[in-house]
Amino acid sequence: EYACDTLLLSCGLIPENELSRELGVKLNPVTSGPVVDESLETNVPGVFACGNVLHVHDLVDFVSEEADRAGTCAARYILQENQSSNPGIDQESQYSDSDIGKASKMNDNNDPVIPLISTGCVRYTVPSAIHLSKMPDKLKVRFRVGKVVKNCAVDVYCNEENSEKRIKTKKRPVVAPGEMEEILLGREELLKYP
């Protein structure tokens, strides 16, 4: 028991994205936030998203970390004379059944783009796609699950010519919808697969 004067509850948060809609930013139907790549850039060149506008966070530490990454990538974008980090990406691929099974696509610059496809209990991932040429050595992928699961493993697979190869596994005693999860992907791990 804790003595207190006020209890504030934050329930059922939905990201506010009126400005994103006006700009033509594609929104994730699960999070109601923008669909982003590894740089946290949206489908609109030069528009980056982070924090609770992207997806609801549990901890301000995650928001700060994400804001730092988005700010760094936005500064890099400006310094590269406004060259988009994601030209030609089809960021709706996460939601298209026809894209399941494709390990990667090429954008207009022949840059391999890997769509992250949520399956099983995983409801969504941030980012939704990875450009290998822009990916750091290690990339934190955050996600939420749709139900409580005990004694489980989070597996990352690469689909390669109609076969799946597990490239990463992370055992968890329990996962729950109310707690954001994360898994670290290595660039070298992904470069091994076409």
Listing of model-derived features with the role each one plays in the protein:
Residues 25, 37, 64-65, 80:
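Alpha-helix termini
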Residues 41, 54, 65-68, 101, ...:
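Non-transmembrane, aqueous-exposed alpha-helical and coiled segments at domain scale
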Residues 50-78:
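A conserved FAD-binding loop/helix module that cradles the flavin
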Residues 28, 76-194:
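Rossmann-like nucleotide/phosphate-binding core characteristic of flavoprotein oxidoreductases
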Residues 5-57:
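FAD-site-proximal beta/loop scaffold in flavoenzymes
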